[in-house]
């Protein structure tokens, strides 16, 4: 029973150190903008995995890549502070 408790507790803490969100462009003209897509889940998944996430997909209504389980140090777009220079 104690082992099960430790496993559940460890899984909880692993989940706490991750975030979900829209990854942003690092450089160039669109620095600070969400990564655009139309229907290409494969490119979004690859981009998210390069940034340390577990999975990614093209969120169709926002026309932007969305990543799941990103590390906390990976920059993501925020509605309040998002500054897109395009």
Curated annotation (Swiss-Prot):
One MF annotation (Gene Ontology) recorded for this entry: toxin activity
UniProt keywords, alphabetically: Disulfide bond, Ion channel impairing toxin, Neurotoxin, Secreted, Signal, Toxin, Voltage-gated sodium channel impairing toxin
Family annotation (CDD domains): neurotoxins_LC_scorpion
Residue stretches making up the LCN-type CS-alpha/beta domain: 19-85
Signal peptide residue numbers: 1-18
Pfam families in UniProt: Toxin_3 (PF00537)
Cysteine pairs bridged by disulfides in the record: 33-84, 37-58, 44-65, 48-67
Cellular compartment(s): Secreted
Tissue specificity annotation: Expressed by the venom gland.
Protein family per UniProt: Belongs to the long (4 C-C) scorpion toxin superfamily. Sodium channel inhibitor family. Beta subfamily.
Function of the protein: Binds voltage-independently at site-4 of sodium channels (Nav) and shift the voltage of activation toward more negative potentials thereby affecting sodium channel activation and promoting spontaneous and repetitive firing.
Protein name per its UniProtKB record: Neurotoxin LmNaTx17
Lineage of the species this protein comes from: Eukaryota, Metazoa, Ecdysozoa, Arthropoda, Chelicerata
